[in-house]
Amino acid sequence: VDAISPGINLEPVFKLLNDPTIIKVFHACRQDMEIFFHLTNNTPKPVFDTQIAAMVCGYGDAISYDKLVKQILGIEIDKSSRFTDWSQRPLSNTQLNYALSDVTHLRKIYEKLKKQLRENGRETWLVEELDFVTSTTTYMIDPEKVWLRLKVRSGRPQFLILVQAIAAF
């Protein structure tokens, strides 16, 4: 699905994402959840985030998809198209193949991580992490706190007060 294709109807995708009987598997889903929240005022549920599951299983705090695929499946993923111009249409065959390879292994990774979580008795740990990521309150913007999302390099109180006021505006 080319989500930014002119005139595309994303309703079938949103219907799938909101189907509570289908587990949606992502890797590092937080930005996706934020986008879905701002588009639909909701987040997909249930979800399984392979990056969060990998953290719970001991693969590190923020393992990349290609490293996770390499560690669990022993497969190298070509990431050479990662920084190409994805706004340019039509997408090249190289970009399409990259996009396909970026999701091809999700099901196998999901199955292996699910098994590891069960064997290690850590399924509830994952549920707690995913509850936060899929909670709509996680993505609600509080104007009084939005300034905390900015990377401010100054610790001067007057400057911070000004940044806070501008951000809330």
State what each model feature region is.
Residues 1-116:
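Conserved DEDDh/DEDDy metal-dependent 3′-5′ exonuclease domain
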Residues 17, 25, 49, 131, ...:
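Intrinsic structural disorder
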Residues 93-167:
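Mixed-charge, glycine-rich, non-catalytic linkers/tails in nucleic-acid processing enzymes
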